[in-house]
Structures are given as C-alpha cells and as structure tokens.
C-alpha cells in the first residue's frame, strides 16, 4: 500500500522502541491511538505490520478484535538498518527490568500482621481461626449430622408428588 514515508518511519520507530505493536481491527479509525500526535491512520499501521509479517520480521497474534505484533530477531536487525540505529539501542522488550529502587523497608515488620484490619479482613480472619479447633476430627464432623431419619419430597412444580404422611 502506498503511504507517506514519514508515516512508515513513525510506525517503525514506535515498533522498535516498544518491541510490540497493538492495533484494533478497524480500517476506518482515523488515527492510531499511540501515533495520534503524528496523524497516522490505523489502516497504515495495519498494512505496514502486514508487510513486516509477510517478510518474517514480526509475529502476529489476533484476539478480541485486536492485532498484536511482536518483533523477531530478524525484524530487530532489519529495523536497525532501516532506521540507521546503532547496535546499543534495543527494544523495550529486550531490556532487563531493574529492581525497584524505592525506600528500603524496615526488617522488623516482615513476620507481623498489620495492626489494623479492614472489616472484611477481620471477618475472614475470625472465620479462619474459629472454623475448626486444633486437634478436632474433620471427618467425624462431616456429613448429614445427627438426623437419622431423612425425608424426600418432590420438587416445586415437578408433578403432583405424594400426599403428606
């Protein structure tokens, strides 16, 4: 499909930066949501990715009216050559995630529970504690209970049933 070179470059840059591309299957959508600032139609994204897929540079998944494209190793090399990028720049999918550099937590509170529980958590905690006392026999308590005489009645609206005895 004929499309402006600036659109193709914008699509390839986003694909290389993220490593993945998502597009809704809607050829009439005026702009792709992630490339709205560059005025790239969704149709151009779909066709550019279809072209890369046919050459084996991306893998395609489709679910719930959305296309998902993942860069392959050959695709990374192709986009590096096409966009004239150095080998140090890699897609976000290949970068290692850093551990969170937040404030270290005090080590004294690891085994303790929080002092204040919400109502739902307190109810759940009480139920778990009082459900079965330690050392109790679960199998002896299971079953129909102490009633030895059972009475079977017909269901509601399923025939006439027997008269009560």
Curated annotation (Swiss-Prot):
Effect annotated for changing residue 160 to K: Weakly methylated
UniProt cross-link Glycyl lysine isopeptide (Lys-Gly) (interchain with G-Cter in ubiquitin), position: 138-139
GO biological process, one term: cytoplasmic translation
Residues where Phosphotyrosine is found: 12
GO MF annotation, one: RNA binding
Any one Pfam family match given in the protein's UniProt record, by short name: S10_plectin
Record has ATP-binding as a keyword: no
Stretch list, region Disordered: 92-165
Bias (Gly residues) ranges: 154-165
Subcellular location: Cytoplasm; Nucleus, Nucleolus
Post-translational modification: Methylated by PRMT5. Methylation is necessary for its interaction with NPS1, its localization in the granular component (GC) region of the nucleolus, for the proper assembly of ribosomes, protein synthesis and optimal cell proliferation.
UniProt modified residues of type Phosphoserine: 146
PTM annotation (Symmetric dimethylarginine): residues: 158, 160
Ribonucleoprotein among keywords: yes
Predominant location: cytoplasm
Bridged cysteine pairs (disulfide): none
InterPro entries the record matches: Plectin_eS10_N (IPR005326), Ribosomal_eS10 (IPR037447), WH-like_DNA-bd_sf (IPR036388)
Keyword annotations from UniProtKB, A to Z: Cytoplasm, Diamond-Blackfan anemia, Isopeptide bond, Methylation, Nucleus, Phosphoprotein, Ribonucleoprotein, Ribosomal protein, Ubl conjugation
Reported function: Component of the 40S ribosomal subunit. The ribosome is a large ribonucleoprotein complex responsible for the synthesis of proteins in the cell.
Disease entry from the Swiss-Prot or TrEMBL record: Diamond-Blackfan anemia 9: A form of Diamond-Blackfan anemia, a congenital non-regenerative hypoplastic anemia that usually presents early in infancy. Diamond-Blackfan anemia is characterized by a moderate to severe macrocytic anemia, erythroblastopenia, and an increased risk of malignancy. 30 to 40% of Diamond-Blackfan anemia patients present with short stature and congenital anomalies, the most frequent being craniofacial (Pierre-Robin syndrome and cleft palate), thumb and urogenital anomalies.
Protein name, as recorded: Small ribosomal subunit protein eS10
Source lineage: Eukaryota, Metazoa, Chordata, Craniata, Vertebrata
């Amino acid at each position: 499909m004929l499309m402006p070179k600036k659109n193709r470059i914008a699509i390839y840059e986003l694909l290389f930066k993220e490593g993945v591309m998502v597009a809704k299957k809607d050829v009439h959508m005026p702009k792709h949501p992630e490339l709205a600032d560059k005025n790239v139609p969704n149709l151009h994204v779909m066709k550019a990715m279809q072209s890369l897929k046919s050459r084996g540079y991306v893998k395609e998944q489709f679910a719930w009216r959305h296309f998902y494209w993942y860069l392959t190793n050959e695709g990374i090399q192709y986009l590096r050559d096409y966009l004239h990028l150095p080998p140090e720049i890699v897609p976000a999918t290949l970068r290692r995630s850093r551990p969170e550099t937040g404030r270290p937590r005090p080590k004294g509170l690891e085994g303790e529970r929080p002092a204040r529980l919400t109502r739902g958590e307190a109810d759940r905690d009480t139920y778990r504690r009082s459900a079965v006392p330690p050392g109790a026999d679960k199998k002896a308590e299971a079953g129909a209970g102490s009633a030895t005489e059972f009475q079977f009645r017909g269901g509601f609206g399923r025939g006439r049933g027997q008269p009560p005895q």
